[in-house]
Regions:
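A short alpha-helix capping/helix-loop junction motif
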Residues: 93-102
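An N-terminal domain-cap segment
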Residues: 2-13, 17-58, 64-71, 75, ...
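A common structural junction motif
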Residues: 81-88
Length: 106
């Protein structure tokens, strides 16, 4: 049975989160947290979402955001997740070893 579509309407306020695949660590050192913050800022320049707050933990992160266009939260989450995964694989030389994130958002 397929998963029901996620809510992603313009103007809504959402708590989104994502965690490491198998709850693995995705931020190993301070530089990883800083790189992800840069990814967030770049994503905000590309996608029409407002970010109200965020919390980064070693194996997951939380975002409170509002999409300004229907469907934009999903595009934003996909972009930051994919960009972080590419950076992670490049930095830690794990390319080809599978997904880094579990792709969860509410």
């Amino acid at each position: 049975m397929p998963r029901p579509p996620r809510a992603d309407e313009a103007g809504g306020l959402y708590h989104a989160l994502n965690r490491g695949n198998l709850r693995a660590t995705i931020f190993h050192k301070d530089a990883d947290f800083e790189a992800f913050e840069r990814i967030l800022h770049e994503g905000l320049e590309i996608h029409q979402v407002e970010l109200f707050s965020f919390q980064l933990m070693p194996n997951h992160y939380h975002l409170v955001l509002r999409p300004l266009v229907d469907g934009e939260m999903s595009r934003f989450m996909g972009w930051i997740g994919g960009t972080h995964t590419m950076r992670y694989h490049s930095h830690y030389h794990t390319s080809g070893m599978g997904h880094v994130l579990s792709l969860i958002h509410i």
